[in-house]
Each structure stands twice: as structure tokens, then as C-alpha cells.
Amino acid sequence: MATQLTTRARRATRVSRKGSQPASKQDVKQVVKSILGQSLEHKRANLLLPPTVVNTTGNIYCLTQFVIEGDGISQRTGRVINLEQMVLRYRRTLDTTSANSGFLRYIVFLDTQNQGTLPAITDVLSSLDVSSGYEVLNAQQNRFKFLLDEVESLCASATNLSKASTLTFNQKVQVHYGGAADAATSNRRNAVFFLELSDKVATGPQTRLGVQLKFTDA
């Protein structure tokens, strides 16, 4: 059967100004890709992290490891997914007891070389400072692919005490897993992470992050 399909594909023709010509392999691939794309089931998964205080030690979260293996609409059937869209709803509020303004940095990135770990913030940045550059060794090896890197101020005033953003990423990427569970040990190539860091030693800003993923099984 496979031989017959291959033979038919090779004999497929297309119409051009000069008449009928054999279809190229690229033409056949595009047709097959289109048919398969229409038949794939698109899945969605949501994650809502609890309110968190951000200080000079920072926080880092994996945004893809919560997609566990299973048969549900929010689960994956194997060890690879095609991530098509990621929407982040990020809210941050300066602590009301703080009389001084503060800076907050947040970064969204892929770990292209992950092997079952949660990276340390100092794997990403050269120091625990809002103005720090990227850690040089991992930057040299192109370990991380950065999708967003922002620094903003939260002022101790009624006009700039809180901020909220909806961040949409439509970059398509294959995310790999090494296990079935929601655990750091399941993280593999192209796991997506969120890093947040402030310049407040104490009474840092409080943040909350909601995540929605749209994906297909690979």
C-alpha cells in the first residue's frame, strides 16, 4: 500500500503555462503537510500560579512541564508536542507597605539543551541583579533562546502601583519531554521558562502569572 501511494505521489502532475509537468517533491510534501495539519487535534492547557513575592533571589518557573502524558484535551500522548501559541497574563503589584519604588525584570526563554532540570537564575544571568547581563558560558553556547526580556519600574504611588499585561507568543516550536509526569525531570529540549527578579531585598512586588498553551501532539 505504501509503495502504491509513493508511486501515485511521484506521478502527480501540476498545470503550468507550458502544460502538465511532474510535481516536485516539495509540492507533494506541501499537500501532505496540509492534509495532516487539517486532521490534527489542537489541544489547550491552562496553568495559574499562586501569588508570589519577588525579591533579589528571584523566581523561575517552567511553563511547559505541567502538560502531562495522557488522553485528555490538555495532555500529550507522547514525548514531543508542537507548541503553536502561548499566552501569558502577568500581574504585578508593589507591596503597599513599601515607601520606595522598585525595579522588576521578567524574562521568557527556551532552554535548548535542557536535560531534566530547572535552570538556576545564575545559569541565565551573570548575577542576581536586575541589570545583569546574560551568563557568558551559556550565552556562548547558545543554550537559551530569549523570547522576551523586560525591565520596568513600580512606583510607590496610586498611579503606578500595579501593572498587568497579556503577552502572546505565536512562535511555533517543538517541545521535548523525558517523562510522563509534571516534574522538572521531565524537561528536555526547548522547555519554556519564565524568570522574574526584583531589586527589593524585602517587601518586593507581588506577582501572579496565568499561562495558556495551544499545541498538537507531534
Curated annotation (Swiss-Prot):
Keywords: Capsid protein, Virion
GO molecular function: structural molecule activity
Region spans: Disordered: 1-26
CDD domains per record: STNV
Subcellular location per the Swiss-Prot or TrEMBL entry: Virion
Annotated InterPro entries: Satellite_CP-like, Satellite_virus_coat, Satellite_virus_coat_sf, Viral_coat
Compositionally biased spans, kind Basic residues: 8-17
Pfam families according to UniProt: TNV_CP
Major location category of this protein: virion
Domain of life, per lineage: Viruses
Annotated Gene Ontology cellular component terms: viral capsid
Membrane-spanning intervals of the chain: none
Identification of the protein by name: Coat protein
Organism this protein belongs to: Maize white line mosaic Satellite virus (MWLMV)
